[in-house]
Amino acid sequence: MKRYPQDPAPPKASGYFRERITPPRMLMTKPAPAKASSASTEDLQRICSQVRRDIIRMTHGAASGHPGGSLGCTEYLVALYFKVMAHDPSAWDMDGRDQDLFFLSNGHISPVWYSVLARSGYFPVKELATFRKLDSRLQGHPTTHEGLPGVRMASGSLGQGLSVGIGAALAKRLNGDDRLVYTLHGDGELQEGQVWEAAMSAAGHRVDNLIATVDWNGRQIDGDVDDVMPLGDLPAKWKAFGWDVLVEDHGNDMDRVLAALAEAKSRTGKGRPVVILLRTEMGQGVDYMMGTHKWHGVAPNDEQAARALEQLEETLGDY
């Protein structure tokens, strides 16, 4: 993990279908404070393998979806939900009072998020089999009107997640809630102007309980990001907008991801929002999907899915 050179030294860290949907539980009393998990790196790596199997099986079963970015972000989301974030699936409600919140801005990578939500206890794992099916709560882009626990915003219309995250972080500040807000964005998504309006706003309002992460895989649906719309010096850009910038070049190494998230947490509360620029590999874990943008939004066929599943250990049991 690299600290952007101009940064000061960091401080020391001291039912499946619509008829089965029920409204989110509204808590009438303050829940017990949520706590982060004590899962080991080995535990998290085993979960990653199963989540990647889920991604392949979901997109193959639906014959559509976005496997590439989902596979690349697996370590980040597994680390967040199974180790870092303070959250309690049994106390789910839309407010998330006294819990850390997460917003997925690049909603097309819903397969990895749905798998992580299910495997961490937000809804039954077997519901993953309904991905993109008619009347399923697990549509290609997450929505709130389906009533899926864990989902607090409809996403996939790119560029909006940072704005929502800022609003949630400011609400926590106003409510005296010291929990954090996390957001995830694609690097291609940074071509949306709303991202930079939000980035300027977050710094201007000193939203220092917010940790944004950019999935910096260098690829998007039409090709390499640098060929479609170059981002230039991305760390310098975020720095210029007033953010505390961390660069992690090994976004598919669980230990490095955990270290980056821990460092980011240690920098919160210091007057600036924090961004992690996380270098990942699209299609990580499946040999023929890596190193190309072509699996951004293409589902594997029967033969391709079988080949992928041979490379991914079943560790928690397939749905």
Which ranges hold each PLM region?
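Glycine-rich beta-alpha junction loops
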Residues: 108-109, 217-218, 279-283
